[in-house]
């Protein structure tokens, strides 16, 4: 109904995003996101930052991936604990991983447990994966980063995709950001 608004939302990838990374098992490997703010990468007249809300199910994994452009902070806002693992395999940088202002000595040794209120800074180029810790419930997470482009700045270690194929078996109640014309 509002083409200019729809174009603004789509260009900035604002709104709902639900993915199973093309793997077909959302409960085990999936993520629900809502992009609240986002600029356009490379556009100096645009916001230089992005903010997303992430809803991570208990045991639900976001597979290993890295970003060439953005550095991001992952902040656990509530619910259970978030487990974050790092891998040198597929990484194209080796920056310092920082939890609440303290550098992690060897982030690749074992997953980091983030409790509500804690955060981790993930440098660009570092492969990372996260999931809700088993037995602790679903996790409400915020991501604050440089302007984000999910179409071009996600590099999955295992060659999977970022977006799901949606089976449109009924009319949508809420549009995903990439459903807007």
Question: Which ranges hold each PLM region?
Answer:
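Conserved metal-binding segment of the jelly-roll/cupin
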Residues: 57, 111-146
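A short beta-loop-beta micro-motif enriched in histidine and acidic residues
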Residues: 41-50, 61-73, 77-78
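Glycine- and acidic-residue-biased ligand/ion/polar-headgroup-sensing regions
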Residues: 57-58, 69-72, 76-91
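Double-stranded beta-helix
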Residues: 81-121, 131-181
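A short, N-terminal "cap"/entry segment at the start of jelly-roll beta-barrel domains
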Residues: 1-49, 170-181
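Short, conserved secondary-structure segments in the cores of folded domains
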Residues: 52, 72-73, 110, 118
């Amino acid at each position: 109904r509002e083409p200019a608004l729809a174009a603004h939302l789509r260009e900035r990838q604002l709104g709902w995003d639900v993915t199973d990374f093309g793997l077909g098992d959302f409960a085990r490997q999936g993520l629900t996101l809502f992009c609240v703010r986002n600029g356009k990468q490379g556009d100096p007249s645009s916001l230089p930052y992005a903010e997303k809300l992430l809803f991570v199910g208990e045991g639900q994994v976001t597979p290993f991936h890295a970003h060439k452009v953005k550095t991001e902070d992952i902040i656990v806002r509530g619910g259970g604990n978030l487990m974050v693992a790092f891998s040198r395999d597929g990484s194209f940088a080796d920056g310092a991983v920082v939890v609440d202002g303290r550098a992690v000595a060897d982030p690749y040794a074992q997953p980091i447990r983030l409790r509500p209120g804690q955060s981790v800074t993930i440098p660009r180029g570092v492969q990372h994966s996260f999931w809700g810790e088993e037995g602790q419930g679903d996790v409400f997470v915020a991501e604050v980063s440089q302007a984000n482009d999910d179409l071009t700045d996600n590099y999955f270690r295992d060659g999977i995709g970022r977006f799901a194929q949606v089976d449109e078996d009924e009319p949508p109640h809420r549009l995903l950001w990439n459903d807007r014309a």
